[in-house]
Amino acid sequence: MKEIIYTKANNTNIGIILAAGNSNRFNSKTSKILYKINNKPIIKHSIDLLSKYLNKIIVVVNSKDYKSVKKLLNKSVVLVVNNVDNRLDSIKTGLDCIKCTDEISNVLIHDAARPYITPEMIKCLIHSSEKYQYSQYYLNLVDGLVKKTTTGFDVVDRNNYLQLCTPQMIDYHLFGFLFRKYVYPNNRLSCEILPILNKFNISYNLIEGNHTYLRKITNLDDILSIEKKHEIQERHI
C-alpha cells in the first residue's frame, strides 16, 4: 500500500494528513474521519482544501478505514496505512513515503480531526515559510488550568501557556533530520519540535488561531457545538 512520491517542480510543498486514530472517544458507530459534516466526510474537508494549495497530499489512515477513504480520493492523493495508534508513528509513516530530493521545500502536517481550517490559514503558513523554517498555529487557553502535585493541585496562570495545534509547516530537510534524530524514537529529546528548535537556536513563527476553526473534534458533541457556533456567526455576517 505504500507509495513513494517523486516530485519535479521547484518549491514543492507536501501535506501529511494524520487520520489513523481509532476514534475510541467519538461515541459513534461511524469512524470519526468518515462522519459527515455538511454532507462531506470529516477527512474530505482537509483533503479538498489542502489539495488546492499543496503539490501533493499524503493521508495516513488505519487499515479499518483504508477502503472507505480510498473511495474518496483522486489520483493525486497518496493513501498509506499506520495501525499504531500513535501520532509520531503516523508522521513517520508519512515521511517514509517521501523520496528525499532537494526539490521538496516544506512539509505541512495537519490533523484530520480539525476539518474547519480555512484557505487564509494555509496561505499564511506558506507565506510564513518564506521567512521561517518552522511555523505553527496555536490557541490561547480559555479554561482554568491547574497542575497536579503530590498534595493536590496548584492553580497556574493560563496566560503563561499556549495550546499547540495544527496545521504546522516546516522545512522538509530540517524536519526529516530533527524528527528522525531527536523525536523518533531512540534519542528522543521531545515529542514536539519546538523544544528542539529552541535547543539549536532555530527561529520559528507561532501564529494565533481561532478556536472556532482549529478546535479538535474528539467526540460527537464537539461537532454539534462547533456547528452551532458557526450557525450563530453566519447569522451576524
Label the predicted regions.
Residues 15-17, 58-59, 109, 136-137, ...:
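Structural beta-sheet core signal
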Residues 66, 88-91, 109, 122, ...:
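A general structural signal for well-ordered alpha-helical segments in protein cores
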Residues 153-163:
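A short, charged helix-loop
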Residues 21-24, 64, 112-115, 142, ...:
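Short glycine-rich anion-binding loops that position phosphate/pyrophosphate groups of nucleotides
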Residues 17, 43, 94, 111, ...:
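Residue-level signal for inorganic ion chemistry
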Residues 2-66:
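N-terminal glycine-rich phosphate-binding loop and ensuing alpha1 helix
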Residues 79-80, 85-151, 165:
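Conserved beta-loop-beta/alpha segment of the NTase-like Rossmann-fold superfamily
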Residues 2-7, 163-237:
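Conserved alpha/beta core of the MobA/IspD/sugar-nucleotide pyrophosphorylase nucleotidyltransferase superfamily
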